[in-house]
Amino acid sequence: MTLQEIVDRSRRIVFFGGAGVSTESGIPDFRSVDGLYHQQYDYPPEQILSRSFFDENPAEFYRFYRSKMLCPNARPNAAHYKLAELEQAGKCTAVVTQNIDGLHQAAGSRTVYELHGSVLRNHCMRCGRAYGVEAVAEAADIPRCACGGIIKPDVVLYEEGLDQQTVEGAVHAIARADCMILAGTSLSVYPAAGFIRYFQGEHFVLINRDPTPADKLADLVLHQKVGQVLSQIQVR
């Protein structure tokens, strides 16, 4: 069965996406460390993006975060727009994403569960005041609130747990879906990778450039770029 046939037959599609969905919008996967990286930073990205590092070295955290995690010029790609179109047509019931860029909402998707939070939301750790991304992007050093507290991104760092409400919403959507499209993720990040076990539906589709541990479970496996594949779907 082709992806088009699966989409045509499905009424409750849930899309689960990882970094590979956003790379086509020019957002690099921070795990793909290049040679230049080691000239700029003394620590691996996983260490810099940990809660203990944030607490102990906020200046170094923000130097990395502003340079590598904020991509102000990124725009939604074909995958984001197609998913918004599928939602509008009543076919896609939810997008569950490991990405923190807000591009699904920018493309028009409304029901989006951001497992790892969003760079667009930030808050003061002292008084709780909410800030947009500009407060972080435009700060010269450590972004601070008017009260003097440090502003922290609403992004799930290593050593932090996922937001329980977001997890419950995602699990509920996956459990009710008749089709799950898993895309742009190597399934290496837990607990997010464990979400697929809640899927009880009929069609499990996997789109990823490289093979994943879940390939053998899928009804259809496409080793291609996500935007390339989704852009070909006719919504009808």
Language model region names:
Residues M1-R236:
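Conserved catalytic core of sirtuin-type NAD+-dependent deacylases
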